[in-house]
Amino acid sequence: MNVLLMAYGTPYAPEEVEPYYTDIRRGRRPSEELLKELAERYEAIGKSPLNEITLAQAVRLQALLNLEAPPYPKRLLGPFPPRAPHGPARVYVGTKHWHPSIGEAVAAMHEDGVRRAVAIVAAPHYSLRSVAEYREKVDSALKTLPEPIDFVWVESYEAHPGLIAAYARRLEEVIWRLKNPGKAAYVFTAHSIPLSAVEKGDPYPRQVEKTAELIAKKLALPRFHVAYQSAGRTPEPWLGPDINELLRTLKEEGYEEVAVQAVGFPADHLEVFYDLDLEAQATARELGLRLLRARSLNADLDYIQVLKDLVEAAWPR
């Protein structure tokens, strides 16, 4: 069993910010002003752990795929070694905008003799601006190979019961810390996308809403809101409401506390640490709101079990 696990990627050092964002901007170098702002954001959070988390996800996913326990015997007569029902599993990491790139990962897979694999992005919602672009990069990499690799795609998993349970457990931790639950709002966030993508029928907002709805139902929340964050610096309109705008609305409606969960971001990275923990938190303090964020899934085993389930279900029989 072979797996290509993909994530966005992040620079490791300040000098890598420029080539990283040049790649995001499809070869267009950021202006000096924008570059300075981006560098200051990374400096403010210290460092984005996204690459390390993605690697940990891959290591743990490979371990789970290879260490499936046999059925429990009626009588324990001795050690029962783990078994790998589909043969040894290998999980490769490819990042969209840094190293190892998706192209580098696909080339390594081919060199290792891989001819079929499951492709999955460490993000639960499909979008023309996310998963579809990962797929384009894989397709471009395949064109450079002398022989093809047959990829089976896991394109979204917004309603997977294990994912919902994992998110619900972490939000419940925040609920227990609320001082006045009757005056608390529950907000689920995801990365914004251009409205032009939504107008083309992008299922992304529906999938984000579905995840939020299922978590709220599992926890019997009386109400919930969906907000978007981290909109791009482009003239075109982006999907809203923005988290900071929503916080102002919630204050006007009389809420005192806000429990936030970033359901669009399983792993900690710049847009969690800066856009939520610094920027949104500053907005909340300015408004007199108490904001608490649920911890991320990262490489925790309950999330890795979700990835394992998805990979095994997709693997060709």
Curated annotation (Swiss-Prot):
It is an enzyme of class 4 (lyase). Keywords: Cytoplasm, Heme biosynthesis, Iron, Lyase, Metal-binding, Porphyrin biosynthesis. Gene3D superfamilies: 3.40.50.1400. Its EC number is 4.98.1.1. It catalyses: heme b + 2 H(+) = protoporphyrin IX + Fe(2+). Pathway: Porphyrin-containing compound metabolism; protoheme biosynthesis; protoheme from protoporphyrin-IX: step 1/1. The keyword Protein transport does not apply. It comes from the Bacteria. InterPro entries: Ferrochelatase, Ferrochelatase_C, Ferrochelatase_N. One of its GO terms (biological process) is heme biosynthetic process. GO terms for cellular component: cytoplasm. One of its GO terms (molecular function) is ferrochelatase activity. Pfam families: Ferrochelatase (PF00762). It is found in: Cytoplasm. CDD domains: Ferrochelatase_C, Ferrochelatase_N. Disulfide bonds: none annotated. Fe cation binds at residues 191, 271. PANTHER family: FERROCHELATASE, FERROCHELATASE, MITOCHONDRIAL. HAMAP family: Ferrochelatase. NCBIfam families: hemH. Belongs to the ferrochelatase family. Catalyzes the ferrous insertion into protoporphyrin IX. This is Ferrochelatase. It comes from Thermus thermophilus (strain ATCC BAA-163 / DSM 7039 / HB27).
